[in-house]
From Swiss-Prot:
Keyword terms: Hydrolase
Protein name: Bis(5'-nucleosyl)-tetraphosphatase, symmetrical
Annotated CDD domains: MPP_ApaH
Its job: Hydrolyzes diadenosine 5',5'''-P1,P4-tetraphosphate to yield ADP.
Enzyme class: hydrolase
Reactions catalysed according to its record: P(1),P(4)-bis(5'-adenosyl) tetraphosphate + H2O = 2 ADP + 2 H(+)
Family from the record: Belongs to the Ap4A hydrolase family.
GO terms, molecular function: bis(5'-nucleosyl)-tetraphosphatase (symmetrical) activity
Record keyword Protease present: no
EC number: 3.6.1.41
Organism of origin: Bordetella petrii (strain ATCC BAA-461 / DSM 12804 / CCUG 43448)
Matches recorded under PANTHER family: CYTOCHROME C5 (PTHR40942:SF4), PTHR40942
Lineage: Bacteria, Pseudomonadati, Pseudomonadota, Betaproteobacteria, Burkholderiales
Domain of life of the organism encoding this protein: Bacteria
């Protein structure tokens, strides 16, 4: 199937499985194939720098949306946050071409829509349709690509506000957009984000549900493709696709062909303990 789009889950610095995936006959055999990356290209895995270079090397064949770990790298580059012990982004920050790598990353989108599929890292708020999602993502993209991008990143940390209001401005507006697109998992029935609860899928308390099950979600008529939720794992529904299958935790790196949902998975060695941090 020539000219296919392969949608790929969280790489998180696991370059060896990424190389195996790209070398798989179904992917490597199509010189016109394109690759969608669901964010979190770097961090936690052993080869963040190599992973980033590999994806950049794909040129226009790759579409990569920003994930929370990618934004964390940008914040570290901006001096807004210091890397933690479990981070594996130091080699990127110390690379001789670090400025070029960071510049490439901060010019990535937070949302991409094509052929009825909306690609984001974590999810969308129930009130947002595709047009609204792309417009709000565009606001953050403009800030990250601008001359004051370091200052913009200072505003993104925090869990509030938990729901969308059109009159939000400044830091509040940026936080709710970034949190929805790169951090969301659980919501209330009213669509308010909830970040404190960390339980296995299906064990969430009454009054909470996955963001994609909030009643009346405005994107239910298209397919939202996301990663971010490794404990949820592979999820294939007509309206949502989750592709984070826990590569860095010893799961697999997954690619799904958009046109027919053919699945290719590469088994990964465990690099970090998901319960350790």
């Amino acid at each position: 199937m020539k000219g296919s789009i392969w949608m790929i889950g969280d790489v998180q610095g696991c370059c060896a499985p990424l190389e195996q995936l790209l070398a798989h006959p179904d992917l490597a055999g199509d010189p016109d194939a394109r690759f969608w990356f669901a964010g979190d290209l770097v961090n936690r895995g052993p080869q963040s720098l190599a992973s980033l270079r590999r994806i950049i090397g794909l040129g226009e064949r790759a579409v990569a949306v920003l994930g929370n770990h990618d934004l964390h790298l940008l914040a570290a580059a901006a001096g807004v946050r210091k890397p933690s012990k479990s981070d594996t982004i130091g080699e990127i920050l110390q690379a001789p071409d670090a400025d070029d790598l960071v510049d490439w990353l901060r010019h990535r989108p937070l949302a991409h829509f094509e052929q009825g599929h909306l690609l984001v890292h974590a999810g969308v708020l129930a009130k947002w349709d595709v047009a609204k999602t792309l417009a709000l993502a565009g606001e953050v993209q403009e800030a990250l690509r601008g001359p004051n991008w370091q200052k913009a990143l200072q505003k993104m940390y925090g869990n509030e506000p938990v729901h969308w209001k059109e009159h939000h401005k400044g830091g509040k507006r940026m936080r709710v957009i970034i949190n929805a697109l790169t951090r969301i998992r659980l919501c209330t029935p009213a669509g308010h984000m909830e970040f404190a609860t960390k339980v296995p899928p299906g064990a969430w308390p009454a009054g909470l549900m996955p963001w994609f099950d909030v009643p009346g979600r405005a994107t239910r008529d298209i397919t939202v493709v996301f990663g971010h939720w490794s404990t949820l794992g592979l999820l294939l529904r007509p309206d949502v696709i989750c592709l984070d299958t826990g590569c860095v935790w010893g799961g697999s790196l997954s690619a799904l062909r958009l046109q027919d949902r053919k699945l290719v998975q590469i088994k990964c060695s465990q690099f970090q303990d998901p319960l350790a941090d």
